Amino acid sequence: MAFSFTAFSLSQQAFAGGTANDNQSAMGIATAGAGQAAEASDASVIFFNPAALTRFKRIEVLNVASIATFDNDYTSRQNNDGPPTDDGREGSAGEFFSRKDGYDSALFIPGLFVAIPVNPKLVVGFSASGSHGLLTRYREDFPGRGAGRESDLKVTRLNLGFGYKLTPTLSVGANGSYERYFQSIKLRVNFRDAVSKLGPPGTLAALDLAAAGGGAPPVPDETDAKLRIFGWAFNAQAGMLWEPTDRTRIGASYRPKTRFNGNQGELTINENDGTAAFRQFLRGGLITTTGPILGINGPQAAGDLEPQQQARQSVIFPDEFRVSLFHHYSPKLDLMATYTYQDYTETFLRYERVSNGRLIEDVPQNFKVAHAYRIGLNYKPYKRLTVHAGYGMENGVVGDDLRIPILPDNDRRFYGLGASFTPSRDKTVTLAFGIIDVDAGQVGNNTQVRPVEVSGGEYKGIADLDAEFFSLGLTQRF
């Protein structure tokens, strides 16, 4: 068995339903994403259904600035929870680990959307915004720190598309997109836990005895590791908009799976005198004699502990089908709804080394299909003021048996509230507040992580993630 320390849950960030950023505009946040493919209240509709661009009769530019804050909590379900810290501390049943503050617990999400009518039938559009994102921040000493204590996922999408009116009631559209992928994960590397899992019972005690006798360096204390990955992909989207009456619109769109096949980056392990000495011991010390007996490949293990290593991954983001209904019920009230289908069953979490192709880590998740349902309304109490509200829900795509701390995906609900002020026919300002409330779920039950020594320690807890969105949107018409 290879003595491979370097993965330690490097792949466990957010590809599940909770990472898809449907909060493209302030109005969209306020209505919890209802009516996205049919309402066309602003130019962000290019992200959801390019066919609905035909609703625009003037040039429109939408600038959006949103702040998303993330709260991460962990509660231990057992005593002696997680591998001991350097000072011997472990979690206790019912102990609460919370981290809800700090500037690094928030994401800034800008967005730019443009719609330009070319003639009465053709409208082109452009957008630049975040399509997926997640931020998790746990306390440094929480029991699952070996499976990842911080993660940051951002996917930026550039869309260029058009909408074309085939008939007075039917429009079609398409866009092409370029997506830029960024991922950063931090974790604590616990050498003692990894050694105890790697060899037969007594391996750790044998190394401690050898260290006491001067035949080996001490097994190092915990240290930090970090993975940064970059990648890109192209994709496309097609949509249609049907307007059976002047009050009702039905929109639908489909986007195939996004395949990030060339993601590469760097894994860094913080090195100190202790880790350097242990790595040298693996390369040529007593372990070269005893290692084969214990099933440990010392030179290979030393290579796995190099402080800088190139890593790669191939990731498939889900395809997406969306259908929306918008109805202008009265001069003061609009009603809307959206159903979204996202298939995550081909999404896998796997990393390899660039240098030799060996597995860094494979984290089974058995992702499922996500179904989301959203309803919302616009209410105009005054001529220049419109109030927005919405509610939505979506199922989680991973179960209690495989869920991991930095992907605490579970069933969730969306709440939105906001208002738009239109001081003139050329300008609209929107303020919005939204909440994503994710059900707390069990973590630490996944026994299928391979290699076993990188699974992050024996921990069992409850992970809870909630997010809040504050958004400002400015629409200008020309």
PLM features: what roles do these ranges have?
Residues S4-F5, S41, A311:
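Short N-terminal alpha-helical targeting/association segments
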